Amino acid sequence: MYVIVEINGQQFKAEQGKKLFVHHIQNAESGAVVEFDKVLLVDNNGEVTVGVPTVEGAKVVCEVLSPLVKGDKVLVFHKKRRKGYRKLNGHRQQFTEVSIKEVIA
């Protein structure tokens, strides 16, 4: 059984026991339990239920493993030819690692 759940504007395929890296969740502490109720699709052994826009009564219960994980560094380089203009910016996205404890559908 799996579900498609929307977390912080992104969609994830969630199964019990799976770990996910989601966009940073504010005020989340390690070991805290969080629930996500924006379940868009439920697949129960081939029986598919699609929400309009969400499935009523379905939710995903997760435990926060690590509240702040930094992603890989992305470098953005700007240059204008023949003018000597060069600019380098870097960015590291912040994530929260969660473990899916239970899928209620």
Curated annotation (Swiss-Prot):
GO biological process entries: translation
One GO MF term attached to the UniProt entry: rRNA binding
InterPro entries per the UniProt record, alphabetical: bL21-like, bL21-like_sf, Ribosomal_bL21
Protein keywords: Ribonucleoprotein, Ribosomal protein, RNA-binding, rRNA-binding
Record's keyword annotation contains Protein biosynthesis: no
GO cellular component terms attached to this protein's record: cytoplasm; ribonucleoprotein complex; ribosome
Record's function text: This protein binds to 23S rRNA in the presence of protein L20.
HAMAP family for this protein: Ribosomal_bL21
Subunit: Part of the 50S ribosomal subunit. Contacts protein L20.
Family assignment from sequence similarity: Belongs to the bacterial ribosomal protein bL21 family.
Record protein name field: Large ribosomal subunit protein bL21
Organism: Parabacteroides distasonis (strain ATCC 8503 / DSM 20701 / CIP 104284 / JCM 5825 / NCTC 11152)
Lineage, opening ranks: Bacteria, Pseudomonadati, Bacteroidota, Bacteroidia, Bacteroidales
